[in-house]
Design a protein with these regions (language model features):
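A short beta-turn/loop motif at secondary-structure boundaries
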Residues: 36-40, 111-114
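Short hydrophobic/aromatic beta-strand element in the GNAT-like acyltransferase core
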Residues: 44, 109-110, 119
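Short, small/polar residue-rich loop motifs at catalytic or cofactor-binding pockets
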Residues: 105-107
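Glyoxalase I/VOC metalloenzyme domain signal
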Residues: 1-6, 11-33, 49-102, 113-128
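Short, solvent-exposed loop/turn segments that connect beta-strands within catalytic domains
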Residues: 39-42, 50-51
Length: 128
């Protein structure tokens, strides 16, 4: 087997435009491409993850189910992105300006939730 790296992660979301705005406008990820269904409705939006790969935000119906900060259910736990240690204060300020509450912090990582309740971490662990 010759796995060469991360390609993408698909996340099902109810409000694809709102979630895309979080990753694009708050985290600064570039929007790559929009995909439409045969009827012309928006199906998904891809946003580039800095360094390698992308997130495919796939629109679905149904209610999101955000859980507590830490739960013991199988499945996606969080999306963690690397930041430089010197950039941490700027990350916290950017979330405050965007009205995104911090859910939890450790000495290395800042945790928030995207608009649909998915846990997102920005981390300089183990000290970049």
């Amino acid at each position: 087997m010759d796995v060469q790296g991360f390609h993408h992660l698909a996340i099902q979301v109810r409000e694809v435009e709102k979630v895309t705005a979080f990753y694009r406008d708050v985290l600064g990820f570039s929007e790559l491409k929009r995909h439409h269904r045969e009827d012309g409705s928006l199906r998904s939006i891809g946003v580039e993850v800095p360094g390698e790969g992308f997130l495919a935000l796939e629109e679905v119906s149904g209610e999101p189910e955000p859980g507590p900060f830490r739960n013991e259910r199988p499945g996606l736990f969080l999306l963690a992105f690397r930041i430089p240690k010197a950039g941490r204060a700027g990350v916290v300020e950017a979330f405050a300006r965007a009205g995104v509450p911090l859910e939890h912090e450790t000495r290395w990582t800042v945790y928030v939730r995207d608009p649909e309740g998915n846990r997102v971490a920005l981390s300089h662990h183990p000290e970049d």
